[in-house]
């Protein structure tokens, strides 16, 4: 209803101003600005729904102030360009319409009415309401009743008798199991769901809507609200350190806790969270690659579900035979947005919907088959009678190719329990949320029936039942939950440990690199993660007077304040204010101690603008003083005009990447010498080793041969045509995820470059 009212007010404002208001520059500018704001808000809402499937939420707020990177980002580039072009066209059309009667005299009454209607359209829009609520959630002090509802359970389970298998299905929401909406999509796992305790109304709340957040909510009974973006949790050294979570209780009760997944454990800080709360045995892509049958059988995120669940079954057998009480948690990945992945062993590789194949539905059908196979192995084993199996989604599906069909249904998370000790078949339609999952499991295992804000759905009352406005209530508790992190409020001294790549201050520890905004009463950590912008881009968003401490590789800050460190990959510390003074210190000891030294100086806006502009220079446009191209730092020597076909810097150098160009091409600002030696320090990847690699300058071509280890080769060139471009053509680029950023599409690697130097020859 509010959408229609908002649009009606918008349309009325446009018509009244266009036909009645007449000519006046101020009223035209004011009305166009407000109407333009209406357009921007609604396009933001549309775009947010496209990315998150949940309107304008915390994730959108973070994305708007940082960058969108991660899995499948290329899928969103065209829609993003379309939105920008559409926005430009709408603004142009809006301005043209409003100025149609610019030759008529100005009418104050109609101008005022049009402006008021425009303001009303903004106020009535759902986008404005969502943003207002989001901003309020960032600035509240908390809710006084939080302590009354947040309850810590007993730290142990008296006389535990059951082992636990807990399966997180990536984005595998209960909506997929509606056989009327999606016929025969989930027959195997759906049949198992119908044999157990099926909780049919598990809603998703703020702070529980992505993987690590869903895990925290289900194991600790709280949403993942933090003084930083949740997926950047890999930078912290402990995770809600004061909270009692399900893993803590299991460990205290004699359980050995195991976690198995196909992706890298470091992503989003899953390793930190699990280690902080009772899990001593963790297996991710790095740990599994030496034990799986085929270490090359991987998707963009890691190992496929069939591989992961096979390893989980082996671990279940091993632990069951040992007689040791255990919990085994596993997380699938094949149903990750935007398209999902199809394991090669499943029978259900294709699912048609609306008369055509749908990749996301196909991935769901395949993954549920793999999960069902794993569960049926457990059920057929002699140890099932001592086991509780839990299957849940980590969160609702995000914007995938099935999303528009899911949105037509009543969407809920998946949560069902199969008890080997006491089979029960029942569908429970009680209102609940993800935070109730851990408390329900704890209750089944013989522990308390509450865990944080979670309550057992078998013997307690969920917050979703107590509060009709549970989403708003959850956001009201956000400051209280953030305080559970026990983050420091001041930073005066700090220590950097180079061996551990950590910084410590006021009792807190963080992984490097790290950016901190420091005020009188708050220290705000801004870690770098797969989903965040580089720290220098985050720093560029600081106000002129914001105090900062930035710990990063020296070359990243050298172009601003320490050009002598432009080629250093050591750690450096910079601090100060973007509009004031800044200092850079080289971390030259294994354990390095520093102090904050912020000065209350006069703010220079010209300096501030210059710093911000420099911070925002993209990597490939950075230039440094050097007589060679050093590939383990960002940018290129000053003599280089542009380059292509080269991947990002890594600690040793850079790979060529055929996804960015079939050739490595380095164009210099001036012609290369008439006679020169090209000194190349490099290595080859895969089948490119021991193969002739063409290297061209103008019409002359030489051959480079590399092995899998780094070597230095000198090639002799004559350049009579004054060519200014060096071209290297890897013969057989290999598609691989080796060394790739988690969730990104595979790179096509050819040669790995450490240094390229042009040395002029006499004569």
UniProtKB/Swiss-Prot annotation:
Pfam families reported for this sequence: DUF7024, Sulfatase
Primary residence: membrane
Compartmental location: Cell inner membrane
GO cellular component assignments: plasma membrane
Pathway(s) annotated for this protein in UniProt: Glycan metabolism; osmoregulated periplasmic glucan (OPG) biosynthesis
Reaction equation(s) it catalyzes: a phosphatidylglycerol + a membrane-derived-oligosaccharide D-glucose = a 1,2-diacyl-sn-glycerol + a membrane-derived-oligosaccharide 6-(glycerophospho)-D-glucose
Residue spans crossing the bilayer: 1-21, 26-46, 77-97, 108-128
Entry-linked SUPFAM superfamilies: Alkaline phosphatase-like
A biological process from GO: glucan biosynthetic process
Documented EC number(s): 2.7.8.20
Family according to the record: Belongs to the OpgB family.
UniProt name for this protein: Phosphoglycerol transferase I
Organism: Escherichia coli O17:K52:H18 (strain UMN026 / ExPEC)
């Amino acid at each position: 209803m509010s959408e229609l009212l908002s649009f009606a007010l918008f349309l009325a404002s446009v018509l009244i101003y266009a036909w009645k208001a007449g000519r006046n520059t101020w009223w035209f500018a004011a009305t166009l600005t407000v109407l333009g704001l209406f357009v921007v808000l609604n396009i933001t809402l549309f775009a947010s729904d496209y990315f998150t499937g949940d309107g304008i939420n915390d994730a959108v707020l973070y994305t708007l102030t940082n960058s969108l990177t991660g899995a499948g980002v290329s899928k969103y580039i065209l829609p993003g360009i379309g939105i920008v072009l559409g926005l430009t066209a709408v603004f142009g059309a809006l301005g043209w319409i409003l100025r149609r009667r610019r030759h008529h005299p100005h009418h104050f009454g109609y101008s005022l009415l049009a402006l008021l209607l425009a303001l009303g359209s903004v106020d009535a829009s759902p986008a404005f309401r969502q943003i207002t609520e989001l901003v309020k959630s960032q600035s509240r002090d908390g809710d006084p009743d939080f302590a009354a509802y947040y309850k810590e359970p007993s730290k142990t389970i008296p006389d535990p008798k059951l082992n636990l298998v807990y399966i997180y299905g990536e984005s595998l929401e209960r909506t997929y199991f509606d056989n009327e909406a999606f016929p025969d999509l989930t027959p195997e796992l759906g049949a198992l769901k119908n044999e157990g305790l099926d909780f049919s109304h598990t809603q998703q709340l703020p702070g529980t809507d992505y993987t690590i957040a869903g895990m925290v909510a289900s194991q600790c009974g709280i949403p993942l609200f933090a003084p930083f973006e949740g997926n950047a949790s890999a930078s912290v050294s402990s995770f809600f350190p004061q909270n009692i979570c399900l893993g803590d209780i299991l460990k205290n009760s004699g359980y050995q806790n195991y976690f198995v997944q196909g992706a890298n454990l470091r992503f989003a800080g899953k390793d930190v969270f699990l280690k902080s709360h009772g899990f001593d045995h963790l297996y991710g892509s790095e740990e599994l690659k030496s034990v799986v049958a085929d270490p090359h059988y991987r998707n963009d995120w890691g190992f496929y579900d069939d591989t992961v669940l096979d390893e989980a079954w082996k671990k279940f057998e091993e632990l069951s035979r040992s007689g040791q009480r255990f919990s085994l948690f596993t997380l699938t990945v094949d149903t990750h947005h935007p398209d999902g992945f199809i394991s090669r062993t499943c029978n259900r590789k294709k699912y048609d919907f609306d008369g055509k194949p749908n990749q996301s539905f196909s991935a769901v059908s395949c993954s549920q088959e793999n999960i069902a196979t794993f569960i049926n192995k457990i059920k057929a084993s002699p140890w099932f009678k001592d086991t509780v199996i839990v299957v849940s989604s980590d969160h609702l599906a995000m914007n995938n190719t099935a999303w528009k069909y899911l949105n037509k249904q009543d969407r809920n998370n998946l949560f069902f329990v199969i008890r080997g000790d006491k089979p029960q078949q029942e569908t429970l339609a009680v209102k609940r949320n993800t935070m109730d999952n851990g408390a329900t499991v704890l209750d089944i295992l013989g522990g308390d029936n509450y865990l944080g804000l979670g309550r057992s759905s078998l013997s307690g009352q969920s917050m979703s039942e107590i509060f009709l406005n549970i989403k708003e209530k959850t956001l009201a508790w956000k400051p209280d939950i953030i305080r559970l992190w026990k983050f420091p409020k001041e930073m005066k001294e700090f220590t950097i440990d180079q061996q551990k790549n950590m910084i410590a201050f006021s009792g807190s520890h963080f992984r490097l690199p790290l950016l901190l905004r420091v005020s009188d009463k708050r220290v705000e950590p801004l870690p770098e993660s797969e989903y965040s912008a580089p720290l220098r881009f985050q720093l560029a968003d600081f106000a002129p007077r914001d105090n900062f401490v930035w710990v990063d590789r020296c070359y990243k800050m050298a172009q601003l304040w320490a050009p002598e460190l432009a080629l250093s990959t050591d750690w450096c510390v910079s601090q100060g204010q973007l509009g004031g003074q800044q200092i850079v210190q080289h971390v030259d000891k294994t354990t390095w101690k520093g102090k904050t030294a912020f000065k209350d100086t006069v703010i220079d806006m010209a300096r501030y603008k210059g710093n911000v502009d420099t911070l925002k220079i993209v990597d490939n446009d950075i230039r440094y003083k050097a007589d060679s191209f050093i590939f383990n730092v960002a940018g290129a020597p000053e003599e280089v005009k542009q380059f292509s076909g080269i991947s990002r810097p890594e600690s040793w150098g850079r790979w060529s990447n055929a996804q960015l160009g079939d050739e490595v091409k380095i164009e210099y600002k001036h012609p290369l010498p008439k006679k020169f030696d090209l000194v190349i320090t490099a290595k080859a990847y895969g089948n490119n080793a021991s193969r002739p690699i063409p290297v061209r300058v103008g019409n002359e071509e030489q051959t480079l041969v590399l092995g899998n280890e780094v070597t230095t080769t000198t090639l002799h060139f004559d350049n009579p045509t004054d060519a200014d471009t060096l071209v290297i053509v890897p013969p057989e680029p290999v598609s691989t995820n080796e060394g790739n950023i988690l969730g990104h599409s595979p790179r096509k690697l050819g040669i790995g470059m450490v240094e390229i130097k042009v040395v002029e020859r006499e004569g």
